[in-house]
């Protein structure tokens, strides 16, 4: 790409040099025509400047590096129209408008320069088209590279997801193996409660509970006897004979 841009710059430089050379030759013809002392000796038309064309061909890098069959060497410049690619140069137009009609019609002097200019213009156009093609091709390659990068990123993300899923499966498999390893193991048998002696405080608590339970049952029995005795006295008041016993003792036969 750098070599192509360099060739384009060289072609532009050669185009400018050839244009200046043509203007210089036209100005020289005007000076020779206006000089009255040399008008009888010199001709109106300057000789063909083959040295300039040889110098242009010598300094042209594209012609040196061009191979046989290249598009630069195969151009038929004689068939190209002369009004193609007009030169946008106001100075040359001004000078050409002031030239006499006799100098403007001297085509043998300008033929070689015009052919060289047309060839340079055509070559410049071809280089520009080639640059545009290469630029479009580079853009398409960059787009393809970006698409490949996107595919690579997606593939990496997919690999990461697969690795995470594989780790989860390994974890589940290890848990299942641990559960299978626990199943064959037998649990320790507990000793029967009869063989185990209760602690001292537990025994003391049992004794206290039994004592209070017995006292409660005794009081409940005495209360029942007293109630029965009082009911009997209410039903039979005439037969109430004092026995000398306290009412609280009750009748033992009424249980």
Curated annotation (Swiss-Prot):
Query: Where's it found, cell-wise?
Result: Secreted, Extracellular space
Give residue spans, biased composition: Basic residues.
183-192
The lineage's top-level taxon is: Eukaryota
Polar residues bias locations: 87-110, 245-255
Major place of residence: secreted
**Pfam families reported for this sequence:** MAGSP
Query: What span is annotated as the signal peptide, if there is one?
Result: 1-18
Q: What does this protein do?
A: This protein is transferred from male to female's hemolymph during mating, affecting egglaying and behavior after mating.
| UniProt-recorded name of the protein | Accessory gland-specific peptide 26Aa
Protein source organism: Drosophila simulans
Q: Its gene? A: Acp26Aa
């Amino acid at each position: 790409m750098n070599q192509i841009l360099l060739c384009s710059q060289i072609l532009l430089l050669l185009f400018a040099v050839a244009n200046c050379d043509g203007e210089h030759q036209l100005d020289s013809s005007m000076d020779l025509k206006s000089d009255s002392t040399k008008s009888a000796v010199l001709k109106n038309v300057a000789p063909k400047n083959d040295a300039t064309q040889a110098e242009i061909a010598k300094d042209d890098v594209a012609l040196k590096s061009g191979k046989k069959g290249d598009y630069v060497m195969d151009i038929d410049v004689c068939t190209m129209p002369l009004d193609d690619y007009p030169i946008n140069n106001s100075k040359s137009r001004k000078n050409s408008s002031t030239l006499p009609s006799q100098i403007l019609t001297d085509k043998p002097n300008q033929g070689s320069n015009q052919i060289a200019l047309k060839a340079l213009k055509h070559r410049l156009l071809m280089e520009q088209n080639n640059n545009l093609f290469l630029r479009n091709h580079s853009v398409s390659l960059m787009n393809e590279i970006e698409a490949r990068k996107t595919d690579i990123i997606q593939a990496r993300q997919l690999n990461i997801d697969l690795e995470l899923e594989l780790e989860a499966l390994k974890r589940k498999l290890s848990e299942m193996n641990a559960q299978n390893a626990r199943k064959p193991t037998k649990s320790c048998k507990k000793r029967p409660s009869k063989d185990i002696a209760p602690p001292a405080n537990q025994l003391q608590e049992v004794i206290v509970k039994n004592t209070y339970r017995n006292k409660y049952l005794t009081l409940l029995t005495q209360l029942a006897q007293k109630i029965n005795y009082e009911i009997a006295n209410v039903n039979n008041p005439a037969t109430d004979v004092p026995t000398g016993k306290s009412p609280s003792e009750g009748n033992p036969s009424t249980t």
